[in-house]
Amino acid sequence: MNKKIGILTSTQSFGDNYGAVLQAYALSTCIRELGCDPNIIRYKVEGEYVNHSAPIVKRLQSTLFNPNMSLHGKKTLVMNKVLRRSVSPVFSDFTKKYLQFYNEEYLTNTQLKDNPPPFDAFVTGSDQVWNPVIHGNKNDPGYFLDFVPEGINRIAYAPSMGVDKIPENCKSDLKGYLDKFAHLSIREKSGADIIKECCGMDIPVMLDPTMLLNAEQWDKVAVKPQNLPEKYIFCYKFGKSKKMDKTIRQISKEYKLPIVAAPASPEVKFKADYSIGPAEFLGAIKNATLVCADSFHATVFSVIYKTPFFIFPRHSETGKINMNSRMQNILEMLSLS
């Protein structure tokens, strides 16, 4: 009988985040190729969970008045989840077709501890599961697999901290979490540096799961979006950079290339195509003349498909929130910086 592996990853982003879904698909595929049975655990921390079937007013109220959520978390959910209902169906179609989920859903770490899933081993990662900014400037014990019973292997495969530094309150309990892992790795050198400084541990930097599959393997799920122009700029933008907007428009005008945009943030000033799901996201990047993005996974798939790309920083280097290290690390790793 194949060993059953539980995967803890950013399932709260599966309704609208291409990278979150595609890295989960890649990790599941690689685990399956090892002869194991991957099962994604639906873990949505209280305060991050959004009931998409609820009326819009109730969803706004439950988000805005949640005392357990940081201001950044509230803004992210309102902008990227609550208001973008039309995106979810194309994502749910993909996840139903390609991902295998454990039948229980956990809304809190306490629920995980009280009723842990019965797997032979657990993997946390990839994606930004160790990013304290996302979790209200604190570590989320669930993503450090603290609920796993003694004697069962805990594995961290390329989780991302997503930042160059973590709050002081996150440093004190980090070593206690990491000491319990049978196998450790991290996605960015910046994360490895943080762990070295805080815990005195040297852990390897590993590729994001999406980079473990080649273009031919991704072609098995990639779909070219309908009605695409023959040549176009594919834009995937989270940040607010007006300079990025201006640059993309200049390139579009100079080379007479229309802009095709995937939905990321409603603040983006380009018309988004809401029919683009994870499969179409791959197809849009593969067939683009140029990709312009401030996204880690847009960078990765541009590299995989050898599509010319222009990557922009998402945040100011001096800003309160700075997650640019993810793009910087991957470009340095590939000698493209």
Language-model features and meaning:
Residues F181-E188, C292:
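A short beta-strand/loop micro-motif in the catalytic core of glycosyltransferases
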Residues A192-T210:
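Helix-loop-beta element that forms the nucleotide-linked donor phosphate-binding surface
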Residues D120-K171, V205-A272, P278:
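Active-site donor-nucleotide binding/catalytic segment of nucleotide-sugar enzymes
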Residues V300-S337:
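Catalytic binding pocket for nucleotide-activated donors in carbohydrate/polymer assembly enzymes
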Residues K175-D179, I285:
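A conserved, positively charged/aromatic
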Residues K286-C292:
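Acidic donor-binding loop of glycosyltransferase active sites
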Residues I5-Y18, L22-G176:
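Aromatic- and Gly/Pro-rich donor/ligand-binding loops
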Residues F119, F181, A288:
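An anion/phosphate-binding loop that grips the pyrophosphate of nucleotide cofactors and donors
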